Amino acid sequence: MSGEPPFLFLHIPRTAGTTLNRLLERHFPPETVLSLYSREELQRYAVIDVAFLARLRLIQGHILLSDYDRFTFYDAPVRAFTFVREPVSRVISEYFFLRTWPANHLYALLNEQHITLSEYVTSKHKLLRYKGGNFMTRVLSGIDPDVEPDAALERAKSNLRDRFLFFGLTEAFNASLLLLAEAMGLGDLLYERQNALRRPVSQRADEDERALIAARNTLDTALYDFAKQLFAERVAAKGSSFTARLTRYETLLGKYQKVCALVETRLGVPLGEIEKPKD
């Protein structure tokens, strides 16, 4: 154990988190990583002992902090980080991913009941009611945005600015990785995209659907605009040397991903709706 609090990746769905998880897992021994995604994992690790917690260096999952005032998880301090994404695209991507990936717990519900995108966004079903409206604001603030919208938005903003060790943007993923590497002391940042829908989100919803999603996510849009501006300021503060590093990194990454694609083609890896789906 390093003596430092563990890192905690608060993974908002459809923000390139699966790609990031695979990259991060290369930097930490398996016994020091705790993943909390499935119901089984969440139930199994609902309570953990002090010795188990002490050896953890990375916790990752679709999770909430246990205490947003003290910024703790398992009643212990953590160094939390997250990624955010343009809200309309994120919701559309989540809906179509959940309808496409059979292993998720909403696949049967969405397909057997033929739930449309508009219904997904407005549903009061107990499994869907928090999905389509201001989800990022909810999980980054710890406040119900339906009850206290202004407080939730302001808390989410201040948490991103002051409490999170780091936040990145899905739309600036490579630049985000370089900044995350600095914050976490990481080395190798080469990656292949994981769990991505092959057909662009822009082709998956009509104008009326996009307008409905936007109307249901006004807080998330304000939060994303805030995050985008703050991220740009932090990148600008790094100066021209960071821009040069990013250019070199993206050149190397492009070569790496090209080689990976050639290997997959030669191996005859089948193409599906989801690119390199998670297990």
Language model segments and positions:
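PAPS-dependent sulfotransferase catalytic domain
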Residues: 40-83, 89-192
